[in-house]
């Protein structure tokens, strides 16, 4: 036997016990806690298998049929499958599936369609936008003249009149529609009309709602935008990564050059394999049922929380996420996030529009139903989760240091619920 054989045969448990231990503990956490982080989901066994495949060994700089390395025949097959499937899902003419993340996808569009110093108009982080849409700490806020639009103080809805006024005042080269914490549908046609009125390109970042769009439960931005970006996880249930879509051949060429060699070197072929598998799953008939359940569960969770005395930003949701205003309960986001985690429920603290608290504290939390729906939760289960969340809220309100007895009791109920809907 070759002395290299153990390298190829020794399992992780023998090779690196500390890493194996951490992975097993994370598996146990995912199995035993309710995941309500709106940007997270649970992938299939098939996606895990593809992402853990030998494709991790392969360098494949370039694009299918035009690689800078030899031995890319089967890498080409996998990437072509991913491209064809995502084009079919969103009825797009061109797709790039190589971005390592949504941020890389957004960065590639800016590199392709704008120059440093150009004006970019995007949704402010405070109003529910994303860091990559022009926030000051991000590259997009440093390289570009980033102008930000927000929401109406009374309705908390996007103020399209403000978007239009800012566009005419600042004449942006690029307008970005998309969000990380906005619970309502977007009017892509209105965004495109505004962009056309000032000669700007329209980019839609559909990362959060890509699955909702794929299922036909939200307007398709590919029909309106010059270019569309997304992540592959969240509501699409794929591996962590990104992609870019367009129907414009010239823009597609610029995007390809911006992704490679502009921002990235070799693509992560094992992740692209996972993307291809996930896209194939989206094309199955039961994916629409899944998304319908995600939306119904979000409505059910929201109804319970509202009945329990908390406010929902905009009054409800059109998608998979809820932005919960904790001020009626006299609570803040950071301690609520911590208390819920102690009780077996994971979410994230989140600012609400016009929040006066620091981003590390916040007046709200963001909740989402995709992961719980993936493991099989229905309306009844999400109503139960909502009831348990309210119990933690009320206990924390009575005891700001945390109510250990209530949190542990809720944790036991959450554990029992999760045992009924196992993963992996």
Swiss-Prot record:
Source superkingdom: Bacteria
EC number: 2.1.2.1
GO aspect biological process, one term: tetrahydrofolate interconversion
Main localization category: cytoplasm
Cofactor names: pyridoxal 5'-phosphate
One annotated Gene Ontology cellular component of this protein: cytosol
InterPro entries assigned: PyrdxlP-dep_Trfase, PyrdxlP-dep_Trfase_major, PyrdxlP-dep_Trfase_small, Ser_HO-MeTrfase, Ser_HO-MeTrfase-like, Ser_HO-MeTrfase_PLP_BS, SHMT-like_dom
Molecular-function GO term, any one: glycine hydroxymethyltransferase activity
Compartment annotation: Cytoplasm
Residues carrying N6-(pyridoxal phosphate)lysine: 234
CDD domains: SHMT
Annotated residues for binding of (6S)-5,6,7,8-tetrahydrofolate: 125, 129-131
Pfam families per UniProt: SHMT
Record keywords, A-Z: Amino-acid biosynthesis, Cytoplasm, One-carbon metabolism, Pyridoxal phosphate, Transferase
Site (Plays an important role in substrate specificity): 233
Functional pathway: One-carbon metabolism; tetrahydrofolate interconversion; Amino-acid biosynthesis; glycine biosynthesis; glycine from L-serine: step 1/1
Function: Catalyzes the reversible interconversion of serine and glycine with tetrahydrofolate (THF) serving as the one-carbon carrier. This reaction serves as the major source of one-carbon groups required for the biosynthesis of purines, thymidylate, methionine, and other important biomolecules. Also exhibits THF-independent aldolase activity toward beta-hydroxyamino acids, producing glycine and aldehydes, via a retro-aldol mechanism.
Subunit structure as annotated in this protein's UniProt entry: Homodimer.
Family statement drawn from the similarity comment of this UniProt entry: Belongs to the SHMT family.
Protein's name according to its UniProt entry: Serine hydroxymethyltransferase 1
Organism of origin: Burkholderia lata (strain ATCC 17760 / DSM 23089 / LMG 22485 / NCIMB 9086 / R18194 / 383)
Lineage: Bacteria, Pseudomonadati, Pseudomonadota, Betaproteobacteria, Burkholderiales
Gene label: glyA1
